[in-house]
Amino acid sequence: MFRIWIYLNLSNFVKFFFLKKNYKIIISYIKNTLGKQSKKKYVLLTSQCRIGFLYILKYLKKKNPKKNEIIFSAYNLPEMINVAKNLNYKIRFCDINYKTGFVNLNQIQKLISNKTNIIVLTNMFNTYQDSLKLKKIAKKFKINLIEDNAIYFDNFSKNRKKNYSGSVGDFSIYSFNIMKNVSSLYGGAVTTNDYNFYKFYDEESKNLSDFNFLTLFRQILIFMILKIMSINILYKFIFFKIIKKAHKQQNDFILKIIYPSLRFIKKKFPNYYFTKISKMSLFFTYLQLKNKDLRKNNFNLRKQKNIHYFKNLVNLRKNKILNLIKIKNFNYQNFLDFPILVHNKYKFNYFLLNRGIEIRFKQYYNCAKMFSNREKCKNADLYEKKLVCLPNHPKISINYANYILKNIENYIFRYNSM
């Protein structure tokens, strides 16, 4: 079973070419939906998540020119760090807690100085309560909190009322890229209550060009390739063999298609960054946001598998081979892939590939190692070396999840017998 699931379905893709579209209605609906979830008044739509992030950083540097420091979780996506680097921010990295995957709150307070302008809250493994604790620190020191909600969209915590991820930060950023659970090829958004930022972006966006057609066309080709790869019979007899061989031979050309983060290189902003969101991405985002029943069903199917993996793996973690991230709330920590930490993930990956199982081998990186020689973030380094993810998308059945679990159990038994 192909581990990747593109949430944009082919029927929605085809509709773009045949349905009449009122973009005022489309944009209004997207903004209302994101505004309600994030509890923010202003919603701005961008060509990518990182572009929204870029303009927030430009705005906050202009607003506070004497404050030039930004704090990130060290375990992160390098493209986001590169945005701050290219804008000449002084970047500080905070290590993560090994048990939870969230930033070390004691360390983050030690990193804060009178020049700290921004803390980035990356929703990745955290609970809602974790986010509130970080918000309290940011508020105490009068620091802007940017909440990266790229991989947590629709996740929520419910006590008396629902609180969605994306509702904590002073600014919240969203991604509708091809691999996300709202998949629109490209696309992103910023939500905030800061009217001055709204005016700033409105003025800046006048200089943006239309989204580059060739860039969009390349993404459409990738979309088509991934859809073809997800056809079970083709995947089983053709594509799985190619993927397996690519892993064993470290074939970058193939691996970069299924792991976009491998394409990262440190560079200045490419021209396609400074573009508006395409009409195609707007339309796809609108259709998926409007289909609440499908989103809820996908959410629950993913949660079901996450709970199933956790309950079955929790008793297997009492060894040096496998560890689990602490999960307190399966609604808020409803991961797009189920993360586990394994000793020698190369060996683990090859063992599963030899049994017809594909897992997510690469997630994020220890960006402190990539961008700085100053901060040694050992837990982020361990996550980069140990973390893999099990598939949990709508087409993964409980029977197939059990097959994966059985092989993990066999791997641990074999490893302990050696």
Question: Residue ranges of each PLM-predicted region?
Answer:
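Conserved PLP-binding active-site segment in aminotransferase class I/II-type PLP enzymes
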Residues: M1-K66, L87, K139, L294, ...
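Active-site-adjacent capping/gating segments
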Residues: N159-G169, F361-I404
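Conserved PLP-anchoring active-site segment centered on the Schiff-base-forming lysine
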Residues: I56-S113, L352
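Conserved glycine-rich beta-strand-loop-beta hairpin in the small C-terminal domain of fold type I
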Residues: R3, V14-F16, L255, Y259-R295, ...
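Conserved PLP cofactor-binding pocket of PLP-dependent enzymes
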Residues: N212-L216, N312, I325-N329, K345-L387, ...
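Conserved PLP-dependent catalytic core of the aminotransferase class-I/II
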Residues: I30, D210-F213, F217, I257-I265, ...
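Active-site phosphate-binding strand-loop segment of PLP-dependent enzymes
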Residues: K99-E203, D210, H393
